Amino acid sequence: MYKKYFKRLLDLIISLILIIILFPVMIIVAFLLLVNLGFPLWNEKREREGKNKKVFIMYKFRTKKLNSEKLTYRNRYTDFSRVIDRVRLNELPQLFNVLKGDMSLVGPRPFIPGDNLPEGEISAKRYLVRPGLTGLAQVNGGRGLTHKQKLEYDVIYYDNLSFKTDFKILLATITNIFKIDRD
C-alpha cells in the first residue's frame, strides 16, 4: 500500500516543503557557482533512465570545470565547487525532478541510458520504482561501489521497500552529508 499510494504523496509533500525551505540556498549556491565556474550553470546531457526505463533530464548544478575530462580528479574542481560536490548541494535541483514525478526521494540512483548493466531479474527490478535522490547504495558506499554492487543494493531496496526503509535511508543520508570524505 505504501509503495502504490503513499510514497508518491510523501514525495510530493516533502519535496515541495524542501524546495520552499531550500530555495534561498539553491539561489546562493547557483550564484557562487556562477562566480566560480561561469556558465553553463547546469550539467549538460544529464539524461537518466527512470521507472520503466523512461528517459528524463536530471537537474544538477555543474561543479566541474568545463572540458575537465582530461584533467586529474583534483584539478576538475575549484576549491569551492569541490565542497559543494562533497556535501551534495549540487544535487538540490533534483528536488524538482521529485516534484515532477521523474524521481522519488528514496530509490535506486538513476543510471545513464546505455550503461552496460547486466540483463535479467536483478537489473529489471530497479526499473520497477522511481529512481531516488538518495538510496540504499548511497548510504552504503555510494561513489565507491561498482555498478554490480549498486544493483545488489537496488534489489535489496526493492525487496524491502517500506516507509520504515525509506525513513532509515533518509536519516542515514542526512548523517552522511555531514561526514567529510577525503579524496
Could you tell me what each predicted segment is?
Residues 22, 48-51, 99, 105, ...:
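Short glycine/serine/threonine-biased micro-segments
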Residues 2-5, 12, 127-183:
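C-terminal terminal-structure detector
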Residues 1-65, 169-183:
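A hydrophobic, helix-centered structural microdomain
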Residues 71-130:
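A short, structured surface patch at a secondary-structure boundary
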Residues 41-82, 133-153:
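Short, glycine-rich, amphipathic interfacial segments at transmembrane boundaries or analogous
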Residues 4, 53, 79, 94, ...:
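Amphipathic alpha-helical recognition patches that constitute DNA-binding helices
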Residues 29, 43-44, 106-108, 114, ...:
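Short, hydrophobic secondary-structure boundary micro-motifs
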